[in-house]
Amino acid sequence: MEFIGVDIGGTNIKAGNVVDGKILKKHSIAVNRESSEEKILNDLFLCIDQVITNKSQKIGVGVPGIVDPSAGIVYDIQNIPSWKEVPLTEIISQHYNLPVFINNDANCFAMGEKLFGI
């Protein structure tokens, strides 16, 4: 299975193309914490565009803030003040026409450790 993993941080957005647990391609874009929601979303799309292929099946996103994974909403990111109640799952899913899953980055780390070990 091929999927895209994304880490939205306060200083960088990182994306990787992962196949069978191996990172085949990765890309990173610096984030200006003072940028608008729209600018950061555009940077996010640019980053994903560098790693996505027509074989990609899903996109997973880790966010360092308050997230409702079931609703797909990012309520707050401390290091990106412009992000308040962003319906991130819907935005990314509509842009790429793929299923998208988001969660707090610490939860993503814990799930990865449980599934794959350190």
PLM regions with names:
Residues 37-45, 58-59, 68-118:
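Glycine-rich phosphate-binding loop and adjoining helix at the ATP-binding site
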Residues 64-66:
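Short glycine-rich anion-binding loops that position phosphate/pyrophosphate groups of nucleotides
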Residues 2-39, 74:
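Short glycine-rich, Thr/Ser-proximal phosphate-binding strand/loop in the N-terminal lobe
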Residues 18-23, 51-57, 96-98:
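Short glycine/proline-enriched coil/turn segments at helix->beta-strand junctions
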Residues 1, 6, 26, 58-62, ...:
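Generic secretory/membrane-interface signal
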Residues 11, 53, 89-92:
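Residue-identity detector for threonine
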